[in-house]
Amino acid sequence: MESERLESHLLNKQEEEASSFTSGLLLSTSVVVAGSFCYGCAMSYSSPAQSKIMEELGLSVADYSFFTSVMTLGGMITAVFSGKISALVGRRQTMWISDVCCIFGWLAVAFAHDIIMLNTGRLFLGFGVGLISYVVPVYIAEITPKTFRGGFSYSNQLLQCLGISLMFFTGNFFHWRTLALLSAIPSAFQVICLFFIPESPRWLAMYGQDQELEVSLKKLRGENSDILKEAAEIRETVEISRKESQSGIRDLFHIGNAHSLIIGLGLMLLQQFCGSAAISAYAARIFDKAGFPSDIGTTILAVILIPQSIVVMLTVDRWGRRPLLMISSIGMCICSFFIGLSYYLQKNGEFQKLCSVMLIVGLVGYVSSFGIGLGGLPWVIMSEIFPVNVKITAGSLVTMSNWFFNWIIIYSFNFMIQWSASGTYFIFSGVSLVTIVFIWTLVPETKGRTLEEIQTSLVRLS
């Protein structure tokens, strides 16, 4: 009798999980990750466009470094307010704001005839993608059942990779102005499609919009689904968060939040200081510096980015976060060392043919390793580890820190390469080694655990 009850419970659970995967959930996720696609395009646009923009507008290396990095300054500014904005106007409205900024930014870049207009466009792109980097993972986490949370959250990284790949590939065939115009299409698409997806149920509950909350859940879970229990749980969670006063930046540094804060900030710092942003922004120059055809090199990178991201998206809820992060960091450590070694041997005039092989193997391995872990999982973990009463403040701080670390690397990379190409990648390899130790000692496994379980365990460890 007991076995029959257990079997019935398992069957009901399986049916509930299967029914949670609906066309409404898929549509909503597909629409919001169009913003992630735009983010990827913006990140890597500077790589294929560099030589032509510098030539046609007469820019120096310092000018172009600032143009590339000014987007991260814009991202930093909006990241500070991203949590407050999305809480005030809603997740969908925040995405509309980001789309307007991105469309204006791309048009300004496309029609720029001087450095001021070019930088203005890039700055507005930063404003847009700064909002995207916060609101997209938050919206996906709030609409997705825990069974699919990791995979659906990773679709954010998948579409970023798709945007990066598109720039690497099409940059070989299109003029930089045309490339900027094409990059505005995802934002224009999202502006229209946002009308057809629901607002986040959790945000609706925050403002007491009970009827709209149930309508939103019906769209996400299916018209025939029983959403009353989930709606009640959302209302209860929101009510608890109201009783726990929303904390400010000072409360975020309370001892109980220390472990979560170290994990969030640490992962963002190490993600950037491993050199990932530099490869996205300057891939063509990296190949040119090593004497390898940049059009062939960037095409190879474009081809490998998508399959590995799809594999991770489908397996992250099965394998877990920690194993993928460890594999990712180990791979990046080894591959950065190989890239540095190839530059070192080339500079000394040794094994020239071998250097090209080592470079392409190192870069392909690095990009693949980054994509399976450190590329997207820090954002997934960020959405899981902070208690609800500090989530807005913590999310804004961690997002801003990511943009700040990103700016440091992107602005300094050209100067680091001029100083020592091999030394630059040996430094990145060393940071990747530190990342391995950091993940092993501090980052918990969050697979298959509720947000409450994750956060309670971290508070105990603080």
Curated annotation (Swiss-Prot):
Matching InterPro entries: MFS_dom, MFS_ERD6/Tret1-like, MFS_sugar_transport-like, MFS_trans_sf, MFS_Trehalose_Transporter, Sugar/inositol_transpt, Sugar_transporter_CS
Entry membrane topology: Multi-pass membrane protein
Keywords: Membrane, Sugar transport, Transmembrane, Transmembrane helix, Transport
Single Gene Ontology MF annotation: sugar transmembrane transporter activity
Transmembrane segment boundaries: 23-43, 70-90, 96-116, 123-143, 156-176, 178-198, 261-281, 296-316, 324-344, 357-377, 397-417, 423-443
GO cellular component: membrane
Alphabetical list of Pfam families matching this protein: Sugar_tr
Location of the protein in the cell: Membrane
PANTHER family the record matches: PTHR48021, SUGAR TRANSPORTER ERD6-LIKE 1-RELATED (PTHR48021:SF93)
Membership in a protein family: Belongs to the major facilitator superfamily. Sugar transporter (TC 2.A.1.1) family.
UniProt function note: Sugar transporter.
Stated name of the protein: Sugar transporter ERD6-like 2
Organism: Arabidopsis thaliana
